[in-house]
């Protein structure tokens, strides 16, 4: 019940199985089970995403299977990442890693399947709603999708729009679910609150706006750069005006 710098939906996801298992095996045994099942289950998801991303890379050269094996081996040896999934790892870092990998997979598939941008955006929204580490993830995802649109607008415009919609929609839903109405206007800068929602709505809104611009403003790469820069600057300025207390950093409030 205390304010935390990461979303307490993780606590609920861990506590619920413990509560259900306690009448069957006792609380101590239930906690031990979850100390193993939770992080190792997340590790399985992370490894699956690593394999899928690697397969997407290898498929470009007709080497999907070989790349998948390489991804599995590299993922297993990536100690700075996989140590976040060790038994008893009850925090948010493993969730952030999974959200990041899911967003990467969605971005990679966006050209062939534009709606992949929707669940890539939802993953970025969940990452931001979970903890402040989601801010650089969201920035990187938007920049990557924006660069793809700048260089190949015909291939990536729809995907960029879906990405923006996924970010804005997921953060709106998560804000309503995770933040009490009495806290909606409180400028919390290090966890889910109005500023994080603002970041998502502005970032997602800019992505959607870019693909809705008149053709005259997106005809050449120079015009696309100018349009994206103008909208980005306006978005950042709007956030600064709405949440000046957060300008000093995550722990300003």
Language-model regions, residue ranges each:
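Short linear capping/connector segments at secondary-structure termini
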Residues: 1, 30-35
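Short hydrophobic/aromatic helix or loop-helix immediately within or flanking a transmembrane segment
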Residues: 1-27, 127
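Extracytoplasmic/secreted proteins, especially bacterial periplasmic and envelope-associated proteins
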Residues: 8-15, 36, 40, 49
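Membrane-interface interhelical loops and short amphipathic "cap" helices
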Residues: 25-29, 82-87, 182-192
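Transmembrane helical cores of multi-pass ion-transport proteins
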Residues: 27-32, 74
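Interfacial loop-to-helix junctions that mark the boundaries of transmembrane helices
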Residues: 32-34, 88-90, 191-197
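Membrane-embedded helix bundles of polyisoprenyl
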Residues: 38-60, 64-150, 163-182
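Transmembrane catalytic cores of multi-pass membrane glycosyltransferases
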Residues: 96, 118, 123-253
């Amino acid at each position: 019940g205390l304010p935390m710098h990461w979303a307490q939906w993780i606590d609920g996801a861990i506590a619920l199985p413990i509560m259900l298992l306690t009448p069957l095996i006792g609380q101590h045994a239930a906690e031990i089970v979850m100390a193993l099942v939770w992080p190792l289950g997340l590790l399985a998801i992370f490894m699956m995403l690593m394999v899928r991303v690697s397969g997407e890379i290898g498929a470009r050269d007709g080497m999907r299977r070989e790349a998948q094996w390489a991804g599995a081996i590299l993922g297993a040896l990536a100690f700075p990442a996989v140590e976040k999934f060790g038994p008893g790892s009850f925090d948010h870092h493993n969730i952030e890693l999974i959200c990041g990998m899911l967003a990467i997979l969605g971005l990679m598939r966006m050209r062939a399947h534009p709606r992949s941008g929707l669940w890539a955006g939802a993953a970025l929204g969940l990452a931001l709603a979970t903890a402040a580490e989601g801010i650089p993830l969201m920035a990187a995802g938007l920049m990557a999708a924006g660069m793809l649109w700048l260089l190949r607008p015909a291939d990536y415009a729809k995907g960029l729009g879906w990405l923006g919609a996924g970010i804005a929609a997921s953060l709106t839903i998560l804000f309503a679910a995770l933040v009490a109405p009495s806290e909606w206007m409180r400028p919390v800068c290090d966890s889910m609150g109005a500023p994080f929602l603002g970041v998502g709505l502005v970032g997602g809104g800019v992505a959607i706006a870019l693909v809705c611009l008149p053709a005259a403003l997106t005809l050449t790469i120079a015009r696309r750069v100018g349009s994206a820069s103008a909208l980005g600057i306006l978005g950042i300025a709007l956030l600064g005006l709405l949440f000046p207390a957060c300008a000093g950093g995550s722990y300003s409030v």
